[in-house]
Amino acid sequence: MAGPIHEFAQLPRARHTGNSVWRARRAERPEGATPTVGLIYNPRSHRNKGQDLDSRICPDVIVAQPGHRDQLPEALARLAERGIDLLVINGGDGTVRDVLTCGDAIFGDDWPVLAVLPKGKTNALAVDLDGPAEWTLQAAVDAFEYGRRIKRSPMAITPLDQPEARVMGFILGAGAFTLGTKAGQSAHKLGAFNSLAVGVTTFWGILQALFGTRANPWRRGARMDIRLAPNGVALEHSGLGDPARRQLLLASTLERFPAGIRPFGTLRNGLKLAVMDQVSRMMTLAIPAVLFGRGPRNLRERGFHQLAATGFEIELDDQFILDGEAFPAGRYRVEPGPEIEFVAP
């Protein structure tokens, strides 16, 4: 379901809104009954190698294997009608984004418990949930009964001119982040995934920013107007470079990241932003230290902003990336979505 980077022409929407059927089916189940498990399996995910799921592996699990993103809303609606207690997502970050987006109209603010089997090229959510790379379906089902529960709220991103086109995901980036994602696709082709891909693209981006002029795409960034909720106050600018541009923006509700990076410093809970102005070459050299929490003091004066927010609106002149896929330039509202329980070992 998650493919090469491209802009959504249109988003698939569930024809069933609300979750009354799912709630009713779940309420009918006797106390102590075996949980009903649904599985979304994406054969296109990197580590699934294009193979269909062997149904003998999970005879007691309701399996949905949508061949295309457009089929996902109906697949989720059928699982909801069965009153599932646990929804297992077999795929990477892009598959998780698609499930959350397409399931928004079905489950609303009351989702079943989720589990993620990290099978994609990037699996940042699984890193945050401390999920083993080889986590199995049976292990996820066992964790529903005996494992830990971790609560996370995905970000909800809404185009201000298309409020019905809300999407949900965990990592949003713009400016140099967009270029870095494209470079990451090249790193994937070379066989670098997850933490290694993060290292490769970070190194390449620093080289570009270090030796390029402010006209270099890695240093130029994108025009961004960032307004913080609830009062619409503009995010401060250090005055370095063009005050209408930001070299990079990253927003997320995750708390732990691949390769141990800490882009938000000591901030952990809720929605967080890291925004970089067109910083000096000296500050560019310090970026690796900043990412690992050992950067210089006075980061804001040096053009690097780390903050928590209840939400924000952004207008930008270039596409942004949400969990590996590009969305068009425009004006958007970004805020925390529903709180969802995930199982972990």
Show the residue positions of the predicted features.
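Glycine-rich phosphate/pyrophosphate-binding beta-alpha loops
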Residues: 173, 177, 248-262, 326
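Catalytic core of DAGKc-family lipid kinases
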Residues: 38-40, 46-49, 106-247
